[in-house]
Each structure stands twice: as C-alpha cells, then as structure tokens.
Regions:
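Feature captures the catalytic cores and cofactor-binding loops of soluble hydro-lyases/lyases
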Residues: 105-174
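Fold-independent oxyanion-binding glycine-rich loops
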Residues: 16-19, 39, 68, 93, ...
Length: 174
C-alpha cells in the first residue's frame, strides 16, 4: 500500500498500491445489462460466459414441470405470503431440493449458487426456478452455475433470450 485517502464529501476511501491492474482495459469492454437498474458488467465476465456451452442433452418433461410448479406454488414461503421478495428453487427432475428467498432476486440466485458450491452439488441434471424476470444478468448467473434449464413465472428480456441461445440454456417463462 502506497497511500490511503478518505474523501468525506463523497464518503469514499481510495487505497493506492504498487500492484498493476487492467482496469482501463476492462472499461473498454464495458457492457450495459438488461436488468431494471441498467447495471454494468465488464468484458472479462462476458469472455468467460461466451466460453461456456451447456449440454444440449438436458431435458425436462411436461409432467415434471407441472408437478414442480404445483409444489413450488403451494409450499409455504415468505414469497407466497408477502409477494414482496424473490424466491429461487433448485430442482432435480420433478422434485424441489432447495428453496432460497431474499428481497433481491440477484441475492436469491447467489444463495443457490453458494449452496451448490458448499455442498459440491453437480449442476448438469438440475433445473433452476426463480420468481424473478429472466434478464441478461440472471442468464449469465445460471450459465456460470452450469445449470441447463431455467424456469421463471415471469418473462424474459430479448438480450436474456439471445444469451441463453448462445450458451444452450433452456428457458421456460411467460
């Protein structure tokens, strides 16, 4: 560390180091996302995403989908009570395995990712359900988790669909 500065006016701490960064290179590859907040992702995330191709052999039966949706929509949850939070469910075939909820849809997705990582769960035969819209960010997160099927009770953005096609992710939504 070569220096630390605090700017009270904008409530920011700046830490300087001798380490080199590729920040300027990342800024050149900046991409606006299709989520509600018009977030920003940087090129290295997209470069990593574009290398991932999910298996085209992932299948979901209509009977599994009907059973899953019935189970998810009748299992007691904060989402069903309040409707003011987001829920995500990790499924295998026609069975829900793990429910996670949060006020932020990204956080609910991240909880599933963390759970899978901690429990060393293999994603290739899993189905991912979310109450949130299927924006580009949700597609990227699901693909990075290597889950081949993503379901939502909501719709998707055009860029989300485009990214899903590029990675072989199966989308099911309104």
């Amino acid at each position: 560390i070569t220096g630390i500065d605090y700017d009270e006016e904008i409530n920011t701490v700046v830490v300087r180091t001798k380490l080199k960064t590729n920040y300027e290179e990342k800024l050149k590859k900046k991409t606006l996302t299709s989520g509600c907040a018009q977030g920003t992702i940087f090129g290295d995330i997209m470069e990593e995403f574009e290398k991932i191709k999910l298996s085209k052999t992932a299948k979901i039966k209509a009977s599994w989908l009907i059973k899953l949706l019935k189970e998810i929509n009748t299992t007691p949850s904060l989402y069903l009570k309040a409707r003011a939070i987001h829920g995500c469910v990790l499924c295998k075939k026609d069975k829900a395995q793990v429910y996670m909820e949060d006020v932020g849809r990204h956080n609910a997705v991240d909880k599933i990712a963390g759970y899978m990582y901690k429990k060393s769960i293999k994603p290739n035969d899993k189905i991912f359900y979310t109450t949130g819209r299927l924006t580009s960010e949700m597609i990227i997160k699901t693909v990075k988790m290597r889950i081949p099927i993503l379901i939502s009770r909501n719709g998707f953005t055009s860029w989300g669909v485009e990214l899903a096609k590029k990675s072989n992710l199966t989308l099911i939504g309104r």
